[in-house]
Amino acid sequence: MSDRLLACATYLSPNEHEAAILAGHSIDVSNGINMEDVAVVSQAFQARGVENLIITMGENGSIAAGKNGIHHTHCVKMEHVADPTAAGDSFVAAFCTGLTAGLPQGEALAFASHTAAITVSRMGAMPSLPTVEEVQQLLVERDYQGFDPAELDALKQ
């Protein structure tokens, strides 16, 4: 990707392998996520004009990095994984929706992770996408403490 194109991105959402290729530096996850590596990768993207980076890392969760610092959320594991189709799409859509609803980056990341978890537990693309109510229910069931799931009620209107 050219620097000119990257400079147009307010948010960029590569997976960990794409981020490593574009930044020229990988993130070590052998003993948990190496946050120093995350900072190096984030700075490489910021130097190329990307304001915010959302890195999906599979079972290692996801990271938001940029002008508001670095936030990590764990992968939300489901008892049954049926189909990964649309997981990335639902993750990015939920992250953007969370930001639009007024959630800070770290909380939008958690909302996105819970949304994608429901998505992978179902078959298909469109049929797997959860409603806000379903994500709120999962947040409550998993005793998520980052924000009150009722804050998402505004999305129902």
Name the predicted role of every residue range.
Residues 2-5:
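Structural alpha-helical scaffold elements that stabilize or flank donor/cofactor-binding regions
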Residues 7-8, 49:
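Short, structured coil segments at secondary-structure junctions
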Residues 8-18:
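Non-cysteine beta-strand/loop elements that form the S-adenosyl-L-methionine
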Residues 20-23:
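A short acidic, helix-capping loop that chelates divalent metal ions and anchors anionic groups
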Residues 25, 30-157:
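Conserved phosphate-binding/catalytic region of the ribokinase-like
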